[in-house]
């Protein structure tokens, strides 16, 4: 049977050494962090398994890292898998029956579980038991298997795609938000120390401002800036060195990359600022709809460059200004700017 969990390092874990190991080391998400600390301490004091946890929010904000930290703070085992990997109900049953008492089972992209697998998960989460059908036809019978006390930690970028029965079984829903520049400066400073890279405060701020409020992107940009600085012979990464490297990576002052600018330019040039539907944009950009909705749009919405309306996506005045273009005559921005 194909391994459902991933015990070896994957490409996504290339920065595993930079990840915080405890809640105290974790930067940002202050309210979520404090609540988790309280829930973990309470569960340990009672001697119970922590209630099931759901992390949701845009990609790259630390959902997987927090799941690992939860297991480490509880002092229990950690097993990791993802929704698309669990193809059959039997796959999930195999995972659950191999858990030890108190273990944390992390399911990334939990919104992509199939309905059949999800049905198995309900009694497992609620009653710590599995209901399995044995046999077929008139002779089929249901057998209940007791499971160890465990904590399911789910992660999703699309909370709205979770079914209500599944969502309601998570006792601890935790929303993760984009990071501030100050928080990202701390993330970058810590990562630079671990990488042995000398970085000036203004250099860390320059990278932070272009990291789209996302620690994963901040770490990736920091490593690329390190490469440019090493080849250029910079002993310390200051704002000037960071700016030069990021410009070569085509990451602009707002943190937008080439794909973001293609998205904005398409709405501006072809659709006169919108509204335009997401399926049309996906076809024009040759990108899946999920990429548009999960990767490109959240940050553009966060910084106010675009708006989602019932009729489709539209550009706000700040987007026209960033592109260096004037809204077409008769557009909403053009009317309200007068």
UniProtKB/Swiss-Prot annotation:
Stored CDD domains: AAA (cd00009)
Binding site for ATP: 18-19, 60, 63-65, 169, 179, 216
Gene Ontology BP annotations: DNA recombination; DNA repair
EC number per UniProt: 3.6.4.-
Keywords per UniProt: ATP-binding, Cytoplasm, DNA damage, DNA recombination, DNA repair, DNA-binding, Hydrolase, Nucleotide-binding
Principal place of residence: cytoplasm
Free-text domain note: Has 3 domains, the large (RuvB-L) and small ATPase (RuvB-S) domains and the C-terminal head (RuvB-H) domain. The head domain binds DNA, while the ATPase domains jointly bind ATP, ADP or are empty depending on the state of the subunit in the translocation cycle. During a single DNA translocation step the structure of each domain remains the same, but their relative positions change.
Role summary: The RuvA-RuvB-RuvC complex processes Holliday junction (HJ) DNA during genetic recombination and DNA repair, while the RuvA-RuvB complex plays an important role in the rescue of blocked DNA replication forks via replication fork reversal (RFR). RuvA specifically binds to HJ cruciform DNA, conferring on it an open structure. The RuvB hexamer acts as an ATP-dependent pump, pulling dsDNA into and through the RuvAB complex. RuvB forms 2 homohexamers on either side of HJ DNA bound by 1 or 2 RuvA tetramers; 4 subunits per hexamer contact DNA at a time.
Protein's name in the database: Holliday junction branch migration complex subunit RuvB
């Amino acid at each position: 049977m194909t391994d459902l969990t991933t015990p070896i390092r994957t490409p996504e874990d290339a920065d595993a050494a930079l990840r915080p190991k405890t809640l105290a080391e974790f930067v940002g998400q202050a309210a979520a962090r404090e609540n988790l600390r309280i829930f973990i301490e309470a569960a340990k004091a009672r001697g119970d398994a922590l209630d099931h946890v759901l992390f949701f929010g845009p990609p790259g904000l630390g959902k997987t890292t927090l799941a690992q930290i939860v297991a480490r703070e509880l002092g229990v085992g950690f097993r990791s898998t993802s929704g698309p990997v669990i193809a059959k109900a039997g796959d999930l049953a195999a995972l659950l029956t191999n858990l030890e008492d108190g273990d944390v089972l992390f399911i990334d992209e939990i919104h992509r579980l199939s309905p059949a697998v999800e049905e198995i998960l309900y009694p497992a989460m609620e009653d710590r038991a599995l209901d399995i059908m044995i046999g077929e036809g008139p002779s089929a019978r249901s057998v209940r298997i007791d499971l160890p006390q465990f904590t399911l930690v789910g992660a999703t970028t699309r909370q709205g795609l979770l079914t209500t029965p599944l969502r309601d079984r998570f006792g601890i829903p935790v929303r993760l938000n984009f990071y501030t520049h100050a928080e990202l400066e701390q993330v970058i400073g810590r990562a630079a120390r671990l990488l042995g890279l000398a970085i000036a405060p203004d250099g860390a701020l320059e990278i932070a401002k272009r990291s789209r409020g996302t620690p994963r992107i901040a770490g990736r940009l920091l490593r690329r800036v390190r490469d440019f600085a090493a080849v250029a012979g910079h002993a310390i990464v200051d704002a000037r060195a960071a700016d030069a490297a990021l410009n070569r990576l085509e990451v602009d002052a707002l943190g937008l990359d080439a794909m973001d600018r293609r998205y904005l330019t398409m709405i501006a040039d072809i659709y006169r600022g919108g509204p335009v539907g997401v399926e049309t944009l996906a076809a024009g950009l040759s990108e899946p709809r999920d990429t548009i909705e999960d990767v490109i749009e959240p940050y553009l919405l966060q910084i106010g460059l675009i708006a989602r309306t019932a009729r489709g996506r539209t550009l706000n005045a700040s987007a026209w200004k960033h592109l260096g273009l004037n809204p077409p005559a008769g557009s909403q921005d053009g009317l309200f700017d007068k």
